[in-house]
Amino acid sequence: MHADPIYTLIIVLLILMIFIDTLMRRRRVAGIISLTSSSILILTIYNLLHHEFSDIIIAKGILLNSGLGFRFLTSNIIFFSLLTLLFILSRLRDPESSGFRLLTPSFVFIALSIISKTLLQNITLLSTGIFLSILYIIFEKSEDKGAIRRALLILGGSVVLILIGAGISLHYCPDLTISGFYLEGGFASFIATLFITIACLTLMGVPFWRNWLPTTRDTSGPLSTLIETMLFIVGASILISIGRAMERTSYIIIVASMIGTLPGAILVLREEKKNIITTMRGTLGAIAGVGVGLGYSATIRGAEIIVITGAVALLLMHIF
């Protein structure tokens, strides 16, 4: 890793966020580690272990895009050890938490994605895992059957906007090669737009969990921390790999994909008028996630500004 002052500042901000979160929200914090700061911090540590920003960092771990080398195995083991430690800490704080059981589908598909050798297959597996986890939790835990209707509205509205985004990206990304697997024409741009939108929806999904699950209405609860941290890491990972593949077209595609989050945000604001702060935090988390993905992919200039802006905004949200 290069000794870049910008990344040093990011790390300092993230560490500061943890202490601020612990001190200012002690009465409501069920665990020591904050969901957003911990997830970004884990990603930062993961990159420090690789000592390079010019390669596909997270893709070597969750989204396997290269050969199995010693450094890959070592850093990947440490990465998942840190993630497991986060789960254990939350579990100790609340022995009754069913976070492990609820997150089982995600773990299964992450494991499958590591075994898989094609980036497209990896993203497909991870995306499928995300949706299965969402459906599993809705049917398993939600007492409000209207949550299913809201989920379908969010996903349905997003699919329509995904198609619009694919049409826009078609003009900027006629062809795309992913890990040697060549995709032609509009199909390539559609696939890329689809999965970036899924990643953005994942990062923007924080407010929805709190509406669907009675156990996560306490936004600082262990189960909420587990779910949101996992979503943040998976969403940022997808953005990192796709950001690398899309290169110059990333700006256009991501802007189009972020449009897909509007139905969900509007729905939350309409049904939960007092939930504006929660929605803002979810939006800021998405901004930070996009910045992390693009910043670590080393393909988009100015991504560091997005990361810092998101980190500062999240820091302010923790204080107020």
Locate predicted features:
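Short helix-boundary/re-entrant hairpin motifs in multi-pass inner-membrane proteins
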Residues: K60-G61, G67, A147, F190-I252, ...
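Hydrophobic, membrane-inserted alpha-helices
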Residues: L13-I18, T84-F87, L103-A111, G260-G264, ...
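Transmembrane helix-loop-helix hairpins at membrane boundaries of multipass inner-membrane proteins
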Residues: M1-T8, I18-R101, D175-Y182
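Short hydrophobic alpha-helical membrane-embedded segments
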Residues: Y7-V12, D94-S106, T229-F232, I254-A256, ...
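Alpha-helical multi-pass transmembrane bundles of energy-transducing inner-membrane proteins
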Residues: L23-A30, R101-A188, T202, L267-F320
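Short, amphipathic, aromatic/basic-enriched membrane-interface segments that mark the entry/exit
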Residues: H2-P5, F87-F100, G221-I227, T249, ...
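Membrane-interface helix-cap regions at the ends of transmembrane helices
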Residues: I45-F53, I168-P174, F232-R248, V290-I300
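Structural signature of hydrophobic alpha-helical transmembrane segments
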Residues: H2-V12, G69-L82, L119-G129, G186-T202, ...
